């Protein structure tokens, strides 16, 4: 538009066509502008306004420069941060799976060798350094629910985990259920026998003492009534010291014993749970949560003992 305005400054008159009787002009009128004036680059005396063409500079960059936070305005930096966050999450998931795999066959820590314990301890430390919930007590919705004990270094539980403590009875599950609405904790041990299961649990209240630590005060213990399991199927034979022993002659006797035991178990099952109080001196403890997400919780208790728990319903419970 500046060029058009520049050309409009020149005077211009319309040329009138002469009639047939008129004489041709001997020379062009002085008011007409010669073509050379239109094609010649105009010059401006000093101080006059001149229009210049803008300069355009083009910079070629490659893909690496585009992702460099120093050369990009902000998009590259945001993309780099997003990629780092995704990579961190993937590393955490790999660590979680590696930890769960290393727990296989340890019987919650009872049967773990010293080498396995060292490997588990290293994986726990790595996970704690990537804790996505720095203040677990501010995220009670994650703490809420039932947690299954997968591993512990607490030697006080080892006698309980030992299979020889009661013949034919094993520890089927150890769990902790947290109700963040009522600030209660239930620790439960489920025992499984040939005909029934039963549980021993403790009920407690907890108080928040820091972003990671809660104080626990146990109130009572409960011995649950046995729950009947399916009947035992008596095999035709068993192997003992490499010899097959035929059970057919005594299957009737074994069936009679089983029926009697079932009758006794039904009688016991109809009774209410047995509750008992806990001594005041040993009824308090504290718990420090060092890692927490929707699947895994790592806590440390008195004396530095560590507990690895997996949330009920998590796919990590299915190896």
Curated annotation (Swiss-Prot):
Stretches of the chain forming a coiled coil according to its record: none
Keyword Protease listed: no
Main location: plastid
Sequence segments annotated as region (Disordered): 17-39
Alphabetized InterPro entries for the sequence: PAP, PAP/fibrillin_dom
Localization of this protein: Plastid, Chloroplast
Induction: Down-regulated by drought and oxidative stresses. Up-regulated by wounding.
Transit sequence range: 1-59
Bias (Low complexity) ranges: 18-36
One GO cellular component term noted in the UniProt record for this chain: chloroplast
Pfam families according to UniProt: PAP_fibrillin
Keywords of this entry: Chloroplast, Plastid, Transit peptide
Tissue expression remark: Expressed almost exclusively in petals. Very weak expression in all other organs.
Function: May stabilize the accumulated carotenoid structures.
The family this protein is said to belong to: Belongs to the PAP/fibrillin family.
Name of protein: Plastid lipid-associated protein 2, chloroplastic
The gene coding this protein: PAP2
């Amino acid at each position: 538009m500046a060029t058009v305005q520049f050309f409009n400054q020149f005077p211009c008159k319309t040329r009138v066509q002469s009639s047939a009787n008129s004489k041709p002009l001997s020379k062009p009128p002085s008011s007409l502008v010669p073509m050379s004036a239109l094609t010649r680059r105009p010059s401006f005396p000093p101080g006059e306004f001149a229009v210049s063409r803008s300069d355009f500079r083009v910079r070629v960059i490659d893909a690496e420069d585009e992702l460099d936070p120093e050369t990009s305005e902000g998009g590259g930096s945001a993309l780099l941060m997003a990629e780092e966050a995704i990579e961190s999450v993937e590393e955490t998931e790999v660590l979680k799976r590696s930890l769960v795999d290393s727990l296989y066959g340890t019987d919650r820590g009872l049967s773990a060798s010293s080498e396995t314990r060292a490997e588990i301890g290293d994986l726990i430390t790595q996970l704690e350094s990537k804790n996505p919930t720095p203040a677990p007590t501010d995220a009670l919705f994650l703490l809420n629910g039932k947690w299954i004990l997968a591993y512990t270094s607490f030697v006080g539980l080892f006698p309980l985990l030992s299979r020889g403590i009661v013949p034919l009875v094993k520890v089927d599950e150890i769990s902790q259920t947290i109700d963040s609405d009522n600030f209660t904790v239930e620790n439960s041990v489920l025992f499984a026998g040939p005909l029934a299961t039963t549980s021993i649990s403790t009920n407690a209240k907890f108080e928040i003492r820091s972003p990671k630590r809660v104080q626990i005060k146990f109130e009572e213990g409960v011995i649950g009534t046995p729950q009947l399991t399916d009947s035992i199927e008596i095999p035709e034979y068993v192997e003992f010291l490499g010899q097959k022993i035929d059970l057919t002659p005594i299957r009737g006797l074994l069936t009679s014993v089983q029926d009697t035991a079932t009758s006794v178990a039904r009688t016991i099952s109809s009774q209410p749970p047995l509750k008992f109080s806990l001594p005041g001196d040993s009824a308090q403890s504290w718990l420090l949560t060092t890692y927490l997400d929707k699947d895994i919780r790592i806590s440390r208790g008195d004396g530095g003992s560590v507990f690895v728990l997996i949330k009920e319903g998590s796919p990590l419970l299915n190896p």
